[in-house]
Amino acid sequence: MDAPDWDERYRERELVWSADPNVFVEREVADLPPGRALDLAAGEGRNAIWLAQQGWQVEAVEFSPVAIDKGRRLADHAGVEVDWTLADLTEHPDLAPVDLVLLVYLHLPQPDADAVLRHAAALVRPGGLLLVVGHARRNLTEGYGGPPDPAVLAQPEEVAEVLRRTGLDVERAEEVLRTAETEEGARQAIDLLVRARSVPG
């Protein structure tokens, strides 16, 4: 979907996503010392707002103006400051390198998917961390939710290989299970999680 499609989706519901941070973002980032962070494809800002609450200086990048407006209101309500940038990641916006880069549930076809991964990797300062979370391709047939198009899905090792070629040190690349609460009860989604670090020097 393009930006106008997402604008419409964000208009239709009070919150498209949960107000809580992604469980894997919370788990992987909780013990890191706060610094500067980028939340790429931030949506309504749930992860960016949580980071700001933990003491991070956060820039949230999103291509839907409606999502950014909602994110600003949510950040104000939470009493935290988040810098918002309207930009399309497929156009590789000029962003300053930071200590932590989040790329959470951004699903694009090739070659855009790999190009955005490479751009995200270039935004990690030496010693910093890139965390990629998304729906795994296997989720399409064995899990719950997520895009129905296999062309926009990947497996962890595919993401890891792109990041290795940028020079990042891949610390983890694995499938992880996430419980999704539905009207029919709890369902299991199969996500991918890739954690990669920019090696100093």
Stretches found by the model and what they are:
Residues 98-113:
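A short SAM/SAH-binding and catalytic strip from SAM-dependent methyltransferases
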Residues 64-66:
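Conserved SAM/SAH-binding beta-strand->alpha-helix loop
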Residues 1-32, 35-43, 138:
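Conserved class I S-adenosyl-L-methionine
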